[in-house]
């Protein structure tokens, strides 16, 4: 993805990996120069059919800042996935047999108060709450294909489990960290 970004003229910065996704994300935020931040991973995309809706959303004048929670369609090959919604052909990008939803803030104004927290399953929501920035919803989905590749998914799940253990060790009273670790552990069969 680094090479693809360079091919399209993007400025590409490198950072040493510190076993903490929030550090890497915050480094990228520090390099951003536009008015808006849109968080997207290499195995994710927005459908071209939604580009105009997306442009209209960020082009709207607003009296007060708003961050947008966006639904991610996590495509899967497994029929027993909790919350599975079968593909309907609504999007050409659909993969696998269906998808399960997850929502998180991915679009927000470039504001130094907004930073990611947590070494794994990193979020900006706590920073938004602290800054008093409301969260609005967006009806443009992000299409996530990472769960379609079994070998990579297993490797990633193991890595996330290790990071989850570190996260829980840092805050032993965090029910969210305990829940995330339980899910990751179940996925790797431990």
Task: Identify the meaning behind each predicted range.
Residues 1-14, 18:
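Acidic donor-binding segment of Leloir-type glycosyltransferases
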Residues 7, 26-36:
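Active-site nucleotide-sugar/metal-binding loop of Leloir-type enzymes
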Residues 19, 35, 114:
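Glycine-centered loop/turn positions within well-structured domains
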Residues 22-29, 40, 46-189:
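Catalytic-site signature of metal-activated, phosphate-bearing donor transferases
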């Amino acid at each position: 993805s680094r090479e693809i970004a360079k091919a399209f003229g993007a400025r590409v910065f490198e950072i040493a990996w510190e076993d903490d996704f929030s550090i890497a994300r915050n480094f990228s935020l520090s390099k951003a120069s536009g008015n808006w931040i849109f968080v997207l991973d290499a195995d994710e995309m927005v459908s071209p059919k939604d580009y105009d809706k997306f442009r209209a959303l960020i082009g709207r004048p607003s009296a007060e800042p708003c961050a947008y929670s966006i639904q991610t369609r996590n495509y899967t090959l497994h029929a027993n996935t909790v919350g599975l919604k079968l593909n309907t052909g609504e999007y050409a990008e659909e993969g696998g047999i269906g998808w399960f939803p997850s929502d998180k803030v991915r679009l927000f104004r470039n504001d130094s108060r907004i930073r990611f927290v947590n070494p794994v399953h990193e979020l900006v929501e706590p920073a938004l709450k602290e800054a008093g920035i409301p969260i609005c919803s967006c009806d443009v989905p992000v299409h996530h294909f990472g769960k379609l590749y079994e070998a990579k998914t297993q490797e990633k799940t193991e890595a996330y489990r290790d990071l989850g253990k570190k996260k829980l060790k840092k805050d032993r009273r965090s029910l969210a960290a305990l829940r995330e670790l339980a899910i990751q552990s179940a996925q790797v069969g431990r």
